[in-house]
Amino acid sequence: MPITVNKLRHDTHHFFYKKIGAIFFISIFATFMNILIDMFIKPDMHIVSIMENNKFINASSLLEFIQNMNLNEKHELLKYSILKIMESLISKTTLLGSIIILISVVSEPKKKSIVSSIRTFFLFFPSLFILNFLTTFIIQIGFMLLIIPGILLSIILSLSPIILFFKKNRLLDSIRLSMYISWKYIKIIGPGVLFWMCGKFILTMLLAHFSLINKNVLFLISNISMNILFSILIIYLFRFYMIFLRS
């Protein structure tokens, strides 16, 4: 079966509207999990206010800001940064794992029970979390060097969670296979990832102009919208990999 962008776009559109309720629920659940973890973190409010009130133009301004901190403030900033990274990874892994399980359950001819699906999710979660950590770290290094390497790494690593789920491979094998397949089909996978990135950018720009809306409400809308956008990307990539396995 030939793989085309139009075919994948049509299948993604069809699946999204067919399971729109479940996708919205998962997106909202992941957002509230994010909020719940944020409540438990309880950071030093002095550090949070400093971070929110300072606009860092580049890495040097951030480094200068950190150098002017005392030892206790540096410790609190490090702790806060690590906890926020963990929060983001847990939320992303929950969303990613849930959407992958949802698509696999719908795609299988033999329907699985809810208990079986939840069990599969919890078995899949630890390895997916580690994979997310590795790929996020690699992609961020790419963005630190230049924007183009970051975008390219985002594209070629995008299939790794789906390969991990399908093949039950080791983490590094999933990354390696993702790089090989994504590079080979970059003209098909690239548009999906770029659409997601552009969607995130446009959404961020639009929501930045809604200054009259309550900050917490804006955070909620932003997170749910971002989660839905990411879910669409996962559906697109999952469908690609299903067709790829059959071809």
Swiss-Prot record:
GO terms for cellular component: plasma membrane. Keywords: Cell membrane, Membrane, Transmembrane, Transmembrane helix. InterPro entries: UPF0259. The keyword Transport does not apply. The chain crosses the membrane at residues 20-40, 85-105, 114-134, 137-157, 188-208, 218-238. It is a multi-pass membrane protein. The keyword Metal-binding does not apply. It is found in: Cell membrane. Pfam families: UPF0259. Belongs to the UPF0259 family. This is UPF0259 membrane protein BUAP5A_271.
